[in-house]
A protein has these predicted regions:
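Iron-sulfur cluster-binding electron-transfer modules in prokaryotic oxidoreductases
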Residues: 1-290
Length: 290
């Protein structure tokens, strides 16, 4: 997720959006929290909501979809149930008036798509990409309401503004296996392999994602996932964060967006996105000249 944080801050800064960190924020509890102790997880998230509220933030950016979901769910639960609010406030030792809510990066950019259009419209070539939302960007539908649960389009619309060609495909909201990547890597390889196969079948040349867990599984586990799906040892499909695509469209250089740290090499993809000749093609031409 380090690439995500670096590229997000750089891209939003280039877009003219300044980030201010919620003071003294804490972990949302992640998968371990909501699987083992919902009371603790709710209290952890109410504390973050209360901190954002105290800082005067009616809305705040939660770049990780899992964090955004946990925050939105806690907000929804305590707003609807005063007893849960009292319980969470006691545990967090903070008052919360239910006036602050999280938004994701996709929601932020889609809401500000006129600004994106003004600064970065058509700056990238019409490379075919699969926008992969993962299982949490639009779920549960009761709290993640900014897009359609099964057929979201907001990330596609932002990518299209940048000039990318988004493909229609079947697995844009299927789960990649998330945190099971450490305890059940075989299962993650199967799930991720199905996603790779579906994107490849739709003609995609790269993924665009906005979730660090999805990125990790598609990028880090791609070799074994491709093998599981029967795609062959040579299969490679680069995985870009939405923030990295935006940063390139805004003219930022690859190092500023941490594009050199992926498991699946992004060199040729970035060259194409910058309107340059891919490295492999250039090397082939040099060999022919010899």
């Amino acid at each position: 997720g380090l690439e995500y944080g670096i590229s997000l801050e750089a891209a939003l800064g280039a877009l003219g959006i300044t980030l201010k960190e919620v003071p003294d924020w804490n972990c949302c509890g992640a998968s371990a929290g909501h699987m083992t102790n919902t009371t603790l997880t709710r209290a952890l998230n109410v504390r973050n909501l209360a901190l954002a509220e105290a800082a005067g933030m009616s809305e705040f950016l939660a770049p990780c979809p899992l964090c955004a979901k946990e925050l939105a769910l806690a907000h929804h639960e305590v707003k609807e149930h005063p007893d849960l609010l009292a319980q969470a406030q006691d545990a967090a030792e903070m008052a919360y008036r239910c006036t602050s809510r999280p938004i994701t990066l996709v929601e932020l950019l889609h809401r500000n798509r006129d600004l994106v259009r003004e600064r970065a419209a058509g700056k990238l070539p019409d490379l075919k990409v699969a926008c992969y939302y993962g299982c949490l960007h639009t779920r549960p539908r009761e709290v993640m309401t900014f897009d359609d649960t099964e057929q979201p389009t907001t990330m596609d619309e932002v990518c299209q503004i940048l000039g990318l060609q988004t493909v229609e495909w079947t697995h844009k909201t299927e789960c990649c296996g998330a945190g099971f990547t450490m305890s059940k890597p075989g299962m993650v390889a199967r799930l991720t392999g199905r996603i790779l196969e579906a994107a490849s079948r739709a003609g995609a040349e790269a993924f665009v994602v906005a979730c660090p867990m999805c990125h990790a599984n598609l990028d880090m586990r791609q070799g074994e996932a491709a093998a599981d799906a029967g795609l062959g040892e040579e299969f490679q499909m680069p995985v870009l964060y939405l923030a990295q695509a935006l940063g390139l469209a805004l003219g930022l250089e690859p190092p500023a967006l941490s594009l050199g740290t992926h498991f699946v090499d992004t060199t040729d993809l970035v060259a194409r996105l910058q309107g340059q000749q891919p490295v492999a093609a250039a090397a082939s031409e040099i060999e022919q000249e010899k």
